[in-house]
Amino acid sequence: MTKHEIADVLNEIALLLELKAENPFKVRAYQAGARVVESFEEAELQRLVSAGELKTVKGIGDALGQKIAELHTTGKLEFHEKLKASVPPGMMELLQVPGLGPKKIKVLGEKLGVVDIATLTKACEEGRVAELAGFGAKTQEKILAGIKNREAYGRRHLWWEVFPVSETIVKGLRALPQVKRAESAGSLRRGVETVGDLDFIVAATDVEPVVEWFVSLAGVKEVTARGETKASVRFVTGLQADLRIVPEEQFVFALHHFTGSKDHNVQMRQRALARGLSLSEWGLSPVAESGSESAVPSSKLQEADEAVKKRKGPKRAGNNESVVVANEAELFKALGLAFVPPELREGVGEVEAAEKGELPRLVEMTDLRGTFHCHTTASDGRNTLKEMVAAAEALGWAYFGVADHSKSSVQAKGLTEERLLKQIAEIAALNASGQFKTHVFSGTECDILPDGRLDYDDGLLAKLDYVVASVHSTFSQDEATMTARIIRAIEHPRTTMLGHLTGRILLRREPYKVDARKVIDAAIANGVIVEINASPWRLDMEWKHWRKAAEKGLLSSINPDAHETGELAYVRSGVNVARKGWLRKEQVFNTRELGPVREYLRKRRG
């Protein structure tokens, strides 16, 4: 096992022990052990295990050292397996309900016999949770809302998690000899934060072998549909995938149609009808009567659809009726439009902009020159400073911004003033050493306290290259209070960036109440950058705000909020948000070269 995997097991052991009401010192020992393991370089961990010296490390000891060595060597731990077996499976599931921790779960189990989601739901609906000391009616309401959200969330999946699944399937489809073209479609192709299912469009010379390959994919739990040109499967993860096979001349039309969105497709069909054409997944063909440039009634759309359906089969190229296109750019051109990137197809003005030639040149991954808001083992990160910088350098980045947690984030090992000063000195020495070509900026993810003050004093903040101000506590404030709190932090002269504006955790936690418009206006007025937090669970500030905000002058920075080297790749999902928000390269701070970035931060510090 790697150090990260070992730490995950140790943290799970701590949770299980807490659920079983074991000695708190024992719980803390496993939590501390996980942090120590995270702080090792992989090579150092290997050396300590091989030499039998783990027990000599402060915070580990003999018994824990043996368990870590067992995990590192065999990939499993008998103690862990027995502990899991001793706890009802539903108890771990309860930890996924927002607001429930081990202590509350223990009370619910002892007082109300709660052992899983079903018994918790019943206890809430009967009002028994509200009667418990330390809970009350509001807590009961929050628990029920959390259960409801969890059920809704369970039908969706993070873009980041399903994108590699889709890529693997597309690659496999393209390798089949019968397949001429294959692409993913749907919300995944549009870069939407969460995805309900996967859609694949394929042009093939022979259908049956392709369908058979698809339904036989590894991890398929159930084949939910199988027809002559379609198939649907559900994976063991709950993710559903749909396959549609079309003649090659219909491929582009099907790809456009099933990419969506629904609103975009309606506008495209209206535009086609206004030109005497019918646009569908089958093709682009003349209809009997055309409308005007104004909005076309839905009855006209229905008539056009019926006209397509009444044909004996999909129109083929060469019959002098269907427009022949080789790609989506030609499809848009046939309707007098510039190509609309999939990320923009949400029915929010992209068709009009494409007609006027006003679509932006969207930011791309290759435009990024570095990043900010990254954590190390100094707080709750899983890799050391040097490991993180080496990973940034391997990506070709010119700069890398450290931003470990501030002192009030005790749960994340936030840095005291003394520890932060030590880190600033360490970064300065690393830059001076010439060990890396990538320049390191010293920073902090500084807590915005409940009253809007920052977590460090001005003198210490002035020693940093940049400051990311973020809310990490007291999420229950009303909208006016939370908005004023964040604006006060924005108005602090040392604040460089605002972190994760709404605090949402996708599929887990709703955003706190905040007036995003007022916060955006305050950021613009004070020259504060608002980050696109690219963590797949956050993607905050969300794309729907960015077009108008950027037009007003708001500057963004695509930050991964990385806690380990592999998470630097999260910027890919942040680029999705930026593109969906119509952002150009020049509207994203970390597309700038090192020189201009250093100068900007120098001037910002005053």
What is the predicted role of each segment?
Residues 1-22:
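Charged, compositionally biased N-terminal leader segments and the immediate start
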Residues 3-6, 23-26, 158, 162, ...:
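Generic structural signal for well-ordered, non-membrane alpha-helical segments
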Residues 14, 24-231, 252-254, 273-282, ...:
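Accessory alpha-helical DNA-binding modules that contact the DNA backbone or grooves
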Residues 182-184, 370-374, 445:
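Two-metal-ion RNase H-like nuclease active-site motif
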Residues 191-275, 281, 285-290, 310-375, ...:
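Charged catalytic cores and adjacent phosphate/nucleic-acid-binding surfaces used
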Residues 291-302:
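Arg/Gly-rich low-complexity intrinsically disordered repeat tracts
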Residues 443-446, 573:
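Active-site catalytic microenvironments in core metabolic enzymes, especially phosphate/sugar-handling
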